[in-house]
Each structure stands twice: as structure tokens, then as C-alpha cells.
């Protein structure tokens, strides 16, 4: 047996020498003794391709490329040892999750931590590390029980940690014993079986690409040395370390220590040892700058390089996106102008999570093919989400979030239905479930979902044909969605063991045709040329089946709860990863600096070279701290490197990255993160600055205007990117900035392209103004018709903002409805409750003033009970919380009823109409208009309450409007058309009083009654009567009254002097009205109602003429945008010139009346 060491610095030709040696042997003896080429997992595909592409060999029978795991699989297949299946990392984590739950009561340290996310994974890593370093459960127990007399202050804590780990390690080994092999046991088994393996006997073994080995791997190598004919080890180091391991500060500490261990092993085995040192750098013979970096990077002091620097570039960028875009442009330039292929490029990242998603986005924009080395998590694959959400449904009372998470994976969809149609139906059902609060038994009881678009608390309507059709579709969708999940739920309820639960889940996947659906997704991905996605669909299904098989195999007869089953399955799916091979040869390689292995790379981009990233700070999130590891190492327990050693090894990884390309090296770093926080350059950048003092950093500018005109041409790499940058430059021009002529040329070229639709659309946005153009007459008529039938509130909405009215009444956009109790719902309940009470009084021939407190309470409770099932999809009956809300509402209605009764006792006014309709079947006719443009308009609605009183001047009428918020009548709002309801109601009542009531009436006022349950604050204790009196004052009605003493006295018969507690008016000693009374003359009322009618006409004409401008009003601090549902549609933005509020001047009531009088005089004189 012979052992040869190939030792040389990076780029010295070690791998090339091995490949050439293998190729020579294959040419010389194609069917000779086996050749084993042992490399890391990440390097197997690359080396297989390198050997296979040799044109004169034509295939390989003799030579094979292996990783340790593939070699184990091959040896054990031929020698035995495969009778017990291996358990994957996923299976181990699921088993550990179960063991943690069973034994957490025995833990000394990890009782609380065991419930945290990621704990199971950390434990699995630690136990795997024990196995790799040949530490048995008994060793862990012995370490935990060792004395605590050392100077290490954390030894007691370490002892307790090891105690807990020892329990789990021992229990895991017991669970697997005789049935399964841990995924790390394959190396131990491989070392045992190598003496029996024909593939090893007499073989030539080449080992390349490794920096260090675990004790398990060293045992395998020891057996290879003993049983192979010859073993060649290739290690990156500047010199052999045969007799002594290198100093810990040596750049090649890691590989030097590996050399020392291998040399001592070979020496103990009496192998024939030889060493071949490779000097110089073959890789960098045409790039002296790179040769300088390779040779001088770790030399201090190093001679500054003064030659040409074309092969080396440091790039600075504003942020990570600008950094990647700069690299993408550079790659395009190298391919286009430098004669390189994409496969000649490599991007190395120290922290891939910072760049991975952004890189996919940027490279897609630039049309760059790429392959990201490494295993991507399966967490976001539809199948994994389908399983997780399905179990959430059956365990979590069918919450709508879980149900629709499941549905939106599209794996629940019927196989034979058009997907787009099904998506729309699922969206509609989701909207229904959100609006109706569907959950739990509502899905499983068999009761049909009832759909009603139009519901009234006061009247019952028959279902429309449209409602019936929608209800049918909703129930059909519900049936096919719920049926398989109900079946899964029933099976899970019956299942008691892990085996039966795993079977139930598998049958669910089969029932829903998941294999066929995934295969269809795979075929579509292949047809679209997305080979990586195609691989993922197949791997996801295989991984899930293997997971269930391991689950059932290891713990099949164990009885567990559904909650623990779900928890273990969640743990298992979290550890699932895709293992992908490059789907094409000509791709940019994107790798992790510490794990990836490269060969034949011409241009390397080392990105993200920031402080704290390169070199990387050691991760201390493991189960054992760095101090724990250092102490264990001091007492002779070998584990993986502690943080201090890993930090030292970072410099070797950096060295390997910097020396990896043969032609060009780019080192880049951003100066800020996505949030604008400053990022500092790495010490690597500073070191390169020392080696190349004359080097000028290149700026990867996010915007072209930051670089010279010549450099701006580099931003025109392809049509899509050119369109984006051209649009951004022309946008600067629209803001009166100077731009290069390059962009006008680019604009002309792009607009002349045969397919220039995207460019045209993009460039048209440059001249976009956030304005809504007036609708053409045919469009306006089609939307609104020749006859408008609307409400007063609709006219108020139009006057508040024309566009908001257009969105709601023209486009008929609606907000998504939610199952919640909003202020309008409560207001509707109050209105309807008071109407029901009034109806009961009329039936029993009672007056409000006749009511006792008990009657108020009984009538109020009865009214709310009758209305609750009709309110907002029965929300008041849906939960204990809402039942409590219902009781609160009953108390408020009771309070209000009592106050109304007290008001009636002190008033000469009596209700003459409640919920009085005008238009339609109401007793009053609608308010009608013939507009100047030929259209007609009809306003309909309902008046809360009309009161009448007999006075010496005849019949008086007043309007009372119930509001759940405190408000009065602001004449400025009336003037601007924002508060038209009350005066419209008064106008209609007075105008038609003779037909309706048999005599002409005079306006007495308009009042708002605030429905609420007030709280009284007092600095001193108060008696019950005092409290009631204060509460009574809180219900004073606000509004506008007729400035007549008799009318005021009729509203409050108790008022003789001072302020009224019922209305916002008062009397002086002489009987005249106080100056602070909200009162006007009868003539003023007519002025106001005439103005309201003119406002309606103007609004109606504007609507039918197609006015839809985005001009919301602003009156003091009030604006309709505050509660507008359509802000995302109009995109109103004060920073834009064209978007300004329509500022309305706030004036006192007297000023408003003066304006109206002047306008009336002007009209009379015109």
C-alpha cells in the first residue's frame, strides 16, 4: 500500500494533475483496476463532467467519482449492511421531537428551551456531531458526571447540558437499535465493510477538494490506505506538515493539520509515503495581479504591486441591489465583449441569505442563466404547505385562514376542472367566509351556506335569482373543498398510532390526486423550460413519502396525540431540502464560500465583502457554547472547531475564494443595506488596497446619471433593462434635469422595435398625471342612465369627492366585507330598535311619555332580541363576546328609550312619522328634478322621525335624526353640499304637509339625537337623582331651530329661563331667545332649503355630465379621505401638482346666511 501527498498552494495544478493521471490510466488500461476519485458532495458533478468530456476516452467503466456517502452506498450494496434502512436527518428530527416531549421532565437545562422553534434541529446537529467525532452515549454520560473542581466557571452548566443531551442521545440510539441506522452511521459501517469490498481492493484512490476530515472520515481513509493499492491525497498548503501540525495562526492551519493527521496515520500503517510539492501558480500565469494576491495576501509586510491591474477590480455599490446589477452588467459585458461563457463565471457569497432572493430577481431581469449551489428548503413548496395547512384545518376547528391556505396550494382543486375558474370560485368563497365568519361546524355540519346580498333589519326580501345562483356556486365549491378534509378529519379521529395517522395522511394525498397534480406541474415546468422547478416537484413528493415511511417505520405502533403528530411532522418538513443538479452547462455558478467547490473558473465575483461578513462572525447559536467546546478540547474531547478556530479558518476560505479565478477577480461591497443603514467594507478590501495602492475602486451606481456618458452605455444590456433605465432617465428629464443623449437614442431605438408595446406603455407613464378625465357623454349615460335614482347621502358623497362617487356608484366598487360589528351596523340596530319600540307603542295605543322604566327595558330587550339574528350575518349570536356586546346594546337602547320618554313628557311635540319613506311606497313623494342637460333625477330615502306640534301660528314640524355619534348642523357644510339630509327631510315634510297631514306646516327645526350611554365624571360624590339629571343633559339635541319663543317652549315645556336641557336653545328673562341659541327665522329656513335644492341640481348635472375629478374637499381638518375606501384606486397624493384638496372656507352660520341672502337677491335681480 502506498500513500502520496500532493501539496501546493491554490492554483498550483493539483486537481489538474489528478485528472490527467486518471485520464492517462484510462487511456492505458480502460478495464484495469478500479479508480476511485473521492471528493466532497458539492464537487462530484463537476468532476464527473470533467472526466466524461475527455474526447478520446469515450466513457468510464474503471473510474468513478464518489463522495463519502456515495462510496458507502456502493460498498454496502455489494458487501451487505443495507438490511437496515438509513434514517435521514428528517427522520431523526421527528424522532427527537417525540423523545423531547416524552423526556423533557427529566431535563435540567432545556425544559423551557425545548419548546422553542429550532431547538430540535440544534439538538440533531449536536448529536450528529457526536457521531461524526465518534463520541458514544456512554461518553456523553461520563462527561456529564465528571467532577466540577476545574477552573471553568461554566462547567456545572455544561454538565447539565450534557446530561440532557445524553438522555436524548441514549434514547435515540435505543429507538434505532436493531431496526434503523442513523444517517451518520454509514461511515462507521463503511469503514467496517471496506476490507470486503472488491471495488476497493487494488484500487487507485484519489482524494481531492477536502480541507479537513472528521474522525469518522479518517477511519474510512485509514481503511482505504490499508486495502487500496495506492491512495493520493491532494491538499492546499504551502508545505508538508509531516512531523508537526502548523501554528494556529498559519493561513494553512486547517489543511496543514489534516496533512499531519493523514501522514501520522499512514506512518502507523507502515505505508510507503511520498510527497510531491507543486510550486508556482499555473492558474494565474497569464494574470500577474491574481498571482500577486495568491502569493502575497497573507504576507506581512508585502510588496505593493505596481503593474497593470486589468485582472482585478474592487467595486463599491450604494446597496445590494445596485451591487448585483453592477455585477450583472459586468457579466453581460464579459460574455459579449470578452469572449467568455456564462459557465466561466462564479459568484461567491459568504452569507447567501442576504443575496439569494435579490439575485434571482436581478438576474431574471438581465436574462442571465444561473445555478445556485446548495440545498434549498422545501418549506414553501405547495405540497409541504398543503400538508401543514390540512392538518391545521382538522386540528384547528376549521379556521378560515387554514382552509384557504390549503385551497390556495391548488392541490385541493378538482383534477378535471379549469384552474382559472376554480381560482375565482375559491376567491368568492373566501370572501363569503370572511364576511359570514364561517368556521368550525359550519363547514362539516352539512348545512348549506345561505347567501343574501340584500338584507334589511326592517323588512324581509325574497332571494333574487342572482343570489340563488351565487349560493349554489358557493355550496358546490364548499362541497369539493370540504369533502376530502372531512374524510381526513374522520380518519385522524379514529387513528391512535403513528402508523395509522401516517396512513390517513397518505390516503388523503391519494384521494386528492396529489401525485397526478404534481406530475402535471412538473410537465408544465419542463415545457416552460424551467428545469429546476420540474426537479423540485418530483423531489417534494419523494421526500414526503420517505418522511411518512420513516415516521411509520420508526414509531409505527406508538400511540400519540394528533397535536404531537402534527408537531413532529412540522419538525420533519422543516428539515426537507431540494438537492438539485445544474439543469444546463452554460450557467453562472453561485456558491457559498465555505461549502462550494469550483474548478476551471475564469472570472470570480466575491460579493458582500463587508465588515462582519467577510470574515464571518462565528455563529454561537448552537447547543454548546464556544467556551464549552474550548474546555472539552482542553480535556481531550475532540469536537468541531470552536468560534475562535472558525474565525482563524475564515482567512483560508477568503484566500481560496480570491485565488479561484484564472483571469479576473472582482470584489464588491455595498455601503448601505436595504434600510439605508451604513455598511463598512471588509478588512479584505483594505488588505487588497495595501497590495494595490494605485487601484481605483469602481462605482456600481444604482442610477446611470452618477457615471460618465460612456459608462452609461453599459446600462443598455438588453431590451427589458434598457426600457427600465431609459424610462427612469426620461423621468428625470420631465423634472427638468439634464440627461445624456444616450437615452434619447435608446428611446428612439426601443420605440422602433416591432414589439414595442411594453416600451410604449412604460414611457407613457412619464407623462402620467394623476387626474381623472371627464367621462364622455355615452360612457356617462351607460354608467348612470338618463334617469338617476339616488339618495341624499349619495349627493353628499359626490360633493365631498367626485372620484369617490364615481368609484362607488359608477364602477360600483365595494370593499371586502368582514365578519365584524362596525359603527354603521350598530347605528342600523339602534334605528330599527327604536322603530320596533314605536310600532309596539302604536299597537298598544301608548305614547312615549306613558312609558315606565320597566316598559322601556322590556321593549328594548325585546327589540334587540328580534333584530339580532338579522344583523350582520347573525354576528351578535356568534360568540360569548358578541353576546355580551348584545347585552350592552340592549342597555343603551333601554337608556335611550327612557330619555325619549322623558323628552316626550317635557315636550309639546309628538311623533307623526317614524322611518318615514319618501319615494317608492313611502307616504311622501320623492324629490324630483329635471336637469338642464335633459336628464332627470329622483331622490328617495327614509326620515328617522318627524314630530308635530300645534301652535298659535298653526302646525309646526321638526325633524329628529338618530345618530350614534355626537354632531350638530354646521351651515358651512350645508352650503358646500356636505350636510344636506336634515334640511331635505324638513323641506319634503313642509312641502307635502298639506297632502300628508291635512294642513300647511311651518318649519320648527332639525335636531340630532345622539344615541349613546354616557359616562358622568364628577369631582364630588353625587346622588342618584343628580346622576340621572347629568345623564339627561348629555342627551341634549343639537341642530337648527326656528327662532320663535313659542316653538322653543313647545320643544321644552319646562323651560322658562336659561338654557334648555333638551334642545340647544335658551330664553332670557324677558322671554326672548338667548344669543347662543341655534335658531334662525322661517325665511332663513326657506333660503337654506332652496339652496339645498340648487345643490342637488348642480350635483345631478355634474354626475350625468361625467365629472369624476380627484378633488376631495378640506374643511378645517376634515377631509373625506380619512375614511375613504378608494384611496388605493385614486392614488391621491398631495406631493403631486395636480393633486390638491378643494379647500373650503369655514364660516359662522350668520356669514353663511348672508351669502345665501345675497345669492337670492342676485337671482331675483338677474
UniProtKB/Swiss-Prot annotation:
Job of this protein: The heterodimer acts as both an ATP-dependent DNA helicase and an ATP-dependent, dual-direction single-stranded exonuclease. Recognizes the chi site generating a DNA molecule suitable for the initiation of homologous recombination. The AddB subunit has 5' -> 3' nuclease activity but not helicase activity.
Upper classification of the organism: Bacteria, Bacillati, Bacillota, Bacilli, Bacillales
Pfam family name, one: PDDEXK_1
Protein name: ATP-dependent helicase/deoxyribonuclease subunit B
Residue span, UvrD-like helicase C-terminal domain: 281-586
Assembly: Heterodimer of AddA and AddB.
GO biological process annotation, one example: double-strand break repair via homologous recombination
Source organism: Bacillus velezensis (strain DSM 23117 / BGSC 10A6 / LMG 26770 / FZB42)
Cofactor binding description: Binds 1 [4Fe-4S] cluster.
Note: Despite having conserved helicase domains, this subunit does not have helicase activity.
EC annotation from Swiss-Prot or TrEMBL: 3.1.-.-
Amino acid at each position: 500500500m502506498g500513500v502520496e501527498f500532493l501539496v501546493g498552494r491554490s492554483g498550483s495544478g493539483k486537481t489538474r494533475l489528478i485528472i490527467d493521471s486518471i485520464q492517462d490510466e484510462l487511456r492505458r488500461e480502460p478495464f484495469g483496476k478500479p479508480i476511485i476519485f473521492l471528493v466532497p458532495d458539492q464537487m462530484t458533478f463537476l468532476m464527473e463532467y470533467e472526466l466524461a468530456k475527455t474526447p478520446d476516452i469515450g466513457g468510464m467503466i474503471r473510474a468513478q467519482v464518489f463522495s463519502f456517502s456515495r462510496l458507502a452506498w456502493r460498498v454496502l450494496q455489494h458487501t451487505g449492511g443495507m438490511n437496515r434502512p438509513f434514517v435521514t436527518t428528517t427522520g431523526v428530527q421527528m424522532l427527537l421531537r417525540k423523545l423531547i416531549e416524552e423526556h423533557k421532565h427529566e431535563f435540567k437545562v432545556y425544559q423551557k428551551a425545548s419548546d422553542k422553534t429550532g431547538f430540535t434541529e440544534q439538538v440533531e446537529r449536536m448529536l450528529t456531531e457526536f457521531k461524526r467525532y465518534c463520541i458514544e452515549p456512554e461518553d456523553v454520560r461520563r462527561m456529564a458526571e465528571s467532577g466540577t473542581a476545574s477552573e471553568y466557571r461554566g462547567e456545572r452548566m455544561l454538565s447539565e447540558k450534557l446530561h440532557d443531551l445524553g438522555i436524548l442521545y441514549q434514547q435515540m440510539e435505543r429507538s434505532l437499535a436493531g431496526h434503523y441506522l442513523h444517517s451518520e452511521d454509514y461511515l462507521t459501517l463503511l469503514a467496517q465493510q471496506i476490507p470486503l469490498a472488491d471495488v476497493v481492493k487494488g484500487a487507485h484512490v484519489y482524494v481531492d477538494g477536502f480541507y479537513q476530515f472528521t474522525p469518522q472520515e479518517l477511519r474510512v481513509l485509514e481503511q482505504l490506505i490499508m486495502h487500496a493499492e495506492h491512495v493520493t491525497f491532494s491538499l492546499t498548503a504551502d508545505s508538508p506538515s509531516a512531523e508537526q501540525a502548523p501554528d494556529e495562526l498559519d493561513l494553512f492551519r486547517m489543511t496543514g493539520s489534516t496533512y499531519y493527521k493523514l501522514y501520522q496515520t499512514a506512518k502507523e500503517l507502515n505505508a510507503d509515503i511520498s510527497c510531491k510539492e507543486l510550486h508556482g501558480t499555473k492558474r494565474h500565469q497569464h494574470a500577474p495581479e491574481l498571482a500577486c494576491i495568491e502569493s502575497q495576501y497573507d504576507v506581512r509586510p508585502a510588496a505593493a504591486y505596481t503593474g497593470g491591474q486589468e485582472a482585478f477590480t474592487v467595486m463599491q455599490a450604494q446597496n445590494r441591489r445596485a451591487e448585483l446589477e453592477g455585477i450583472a452588467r459586468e457579466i453581460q459585458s464579459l460574455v459579449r465583449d470578452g469572449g467568455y461563457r456564462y459557465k466561466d463565471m462564479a459568484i461567491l457569497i459568504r452569507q447567501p441569505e442576504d443575496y439569494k432572493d435579490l439575485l434571482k430577481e436581478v438576474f431574471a431581469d438581465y436574462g442571465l442563466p444561473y445555478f445556485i449551489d446548495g440545498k434549498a428548503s422545501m418549506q414553501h413548496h405547495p405540497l409541504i404547505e398543503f400538508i401543514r395547512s390540512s392538518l391545521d384545518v382538522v386540528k384547528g376547528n376549521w379556521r378560515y385562514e387554514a382552509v384557504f391556505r390549503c385551497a390556495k396550494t391548488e392541490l385541493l382543486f378538482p383534477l378535471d376542472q379549469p384552474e382559472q375558474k376554480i381560482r375565482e370560485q375559491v376567491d368568492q368563497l373566501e370572501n363569503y367566509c370572511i364576511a359570514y365568519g364561517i368556521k368550525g361546524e359550519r363547514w362539516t355540519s352539512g348545512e348549506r351556506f345561505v347567501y343574501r346580498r340584500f338584507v334589511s333589519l326592517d323588512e324581509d326580501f325574497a332571494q333574487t335569482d342572482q343570489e340563488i345562483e351565487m349560493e349554489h356556486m358557493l355550496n358546490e365549491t364548499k362541497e369539493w373543498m370540504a369533502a376530502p378534509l372531512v374524510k381526513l378529519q374522520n380518519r385522524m379521529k379514529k387513528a391512535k398510532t403513528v402508523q395509522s395517522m401516517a396512513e390517513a395522511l397518505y390516503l388523503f394525498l391519494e384521494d386528492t390526486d396529489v401525485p397526478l397534480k404534481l406530475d402535471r406541474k412538473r410537465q408544465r415546468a419542463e415545457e416552460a423550460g424551467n428545469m429546476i422547478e420540474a426537479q423540485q416537484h418530483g423531489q417534494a413528493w419523494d421526500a414526503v413519502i420517505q418522511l411518512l415511511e420513516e415516521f411509520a417505520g420508526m414509531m409505527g405502533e406508538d400511540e400519540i396525540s394528533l397535536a404531537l403528530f402534527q408537531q413532529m411532522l412540522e419538525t420533519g418538513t422543516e428539515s426537507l431540502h431540494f438537492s438539485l443538479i445544474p439543469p444546463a452547462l452554460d450557467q453562472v455558478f453561485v456558491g457559498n464560500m465555505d461549502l462550494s467547490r469550483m474548478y476551471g473558473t475564469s472570472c470570480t465575483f466575491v460579493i458582500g465583502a463587508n465588515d462582519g461578513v467577510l470574515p464571518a462572525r462565528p455563529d454561537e447559536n448552537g447547543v454548546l457554547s464556544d467556551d464549552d467546546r474550548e474546555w472539552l478540547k482542553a480535556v481531550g474531547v475532540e469536537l468541531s472547531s470552536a468560534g475562535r478556530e472558525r474565525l482563524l479558518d475564515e482567512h483560508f476560505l477568503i484566500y481560496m475564494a480570491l485565488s479561484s479565478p484564472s483571469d479576473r477577480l472582482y470584489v464588491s461591497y455595498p455601503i448601505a443595506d436595504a434600510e439605508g443603514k451604513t455598511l463598512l467594507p471588509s478588512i479584505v478590501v483594505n488588505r487588497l488596497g495595501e497590495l494595490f495602492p494605485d487601484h481605483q475602486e469602481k462605482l456600481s451606481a444604482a442610477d446611470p446619471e452618477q457615471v460618465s456618458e460612456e459608462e452609461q452605455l453599459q446600462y443598455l444590456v438588453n431590451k427589458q433593462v434598457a426600457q427600465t433605465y431609459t424610462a427612469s432617465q426620461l423621468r428625470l428629464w420631465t423634472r427638468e434635469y439634464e440627461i445624456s443623449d444616450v437615452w434619447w437614442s435608446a428611446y428612439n431605438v426601443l420605440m422602433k422595435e416591432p414589439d414595442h408595446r411594453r416600451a410604449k406603455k412604460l414611457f407613457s407613464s412619464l407623462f402620467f398625471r394623476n387626474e381623472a378625465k371627464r367621462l364622455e357623454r355615452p360612457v356617462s349615460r351607460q354608467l348612470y342612465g338618463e334617469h338617476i335614482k339616488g339618495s341624499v347621502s349619495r349627493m353628499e358623497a359626490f360633493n365631498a369627492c367626485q372620484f369617490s362617487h364615481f368609484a362607488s356608484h359608477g364602477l360600483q366598487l365595494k370593499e371586502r366585507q368582514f365578519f365584524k360589528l362596525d359603527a354603521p351596523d350598530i347605528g342600523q340596530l339602534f334605528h330599527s330598535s327604536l322603530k320596533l319600540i314605536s310600532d309596539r307603542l302604536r299597537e298598544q295605543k301608548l305614547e312615549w311619555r306613558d312609558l315606565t322604566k320597566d316598559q322601556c327595558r322590556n321593549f328594548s330587550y325585546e327589540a334587540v332580541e328580534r333584530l339580532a339574528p338579522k344583523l350582520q350575518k347573525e354576528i351578535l349570536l356568534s360568540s360569548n363576546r358578541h353576546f355580551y356586546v348584545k347585552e350592552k346594546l340592549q342597555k343603551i337602547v333601554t337608556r335611550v328609550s327612557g330619555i325619549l320618554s322623558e323628552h316626550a313628557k317635557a315636550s309639546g311635540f309628538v311623533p307623526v312619522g317614524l322611518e318615514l319613506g319618501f319615494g317608492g311606497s313611502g307616504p311622501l313623494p320623492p324629490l324630483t328634478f329635471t336637469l338642464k342637460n335633459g336628464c332627470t333625477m329622483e331622490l328617495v330615502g327614509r326620515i328617522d322621525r318627524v314630530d308635530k306640534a300645534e301652535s298659535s301660528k298653526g302646525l309646526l314640524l321638526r325633524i329628529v335624526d338618530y345618530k350614534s355619534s355626537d354632531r350638530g348642523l354646521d351651515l358651512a357644510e350645508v352650503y358646500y353640499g356636505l350636510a344636506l339630509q336634515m334640511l331635505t327631510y324638513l323641506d319634503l315634510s313642509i312641502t307635502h304637509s298639506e297632502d300628508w297631514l291635512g294642513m300647511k306646516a311651518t318649519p320648527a327645526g332639525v335636531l340630532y339625537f345622539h344615541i349613546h350611554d354616557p359616562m358622568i365624571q364628577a369631582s364630588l360624590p353625587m346622588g342618584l337623582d343628580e346622576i340621572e339629571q347629568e345623564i339627561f343633559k348629555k342627551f341634549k339635541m343639537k341642530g337648527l331651530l326656528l327662532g320663535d319663543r313659542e316653538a322653543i317652549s313647545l320643544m321644552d315645556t319646562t323651560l322658562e329661563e336659561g338654557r334648555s336641557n333638551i334642545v340647544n336653545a335658551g330664553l332670557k328673562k324677558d322671554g326672548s331667545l338667548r344669543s347662543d341659541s341655534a335658531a334662525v327665522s322661517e325665511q332663513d329656513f326657506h333660503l337654506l332649503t332652496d339652496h339645498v335644492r340648487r345643490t342637488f341640481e348642480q350635483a345631478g348635472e355634474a354626475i350625468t355630465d361625467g365629472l369624476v375629478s380627484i378633488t376631495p374637499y378640506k374643511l378645517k381638518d376634515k377631509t373625506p379621505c380619512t375614511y375613504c375606501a378608494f384611496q388605493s384606486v385614486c392614488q391621491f397624493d398631495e406631493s403631486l401638482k395636480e393633486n390638491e384638496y378643494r379647500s373650503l372656507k369655514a364660516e359662522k352660520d350668520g356669514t353663511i346666511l348672508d351669502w345665501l341672502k345675497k345669492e337670492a337677491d342676485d337671482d331675483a335681480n338677474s
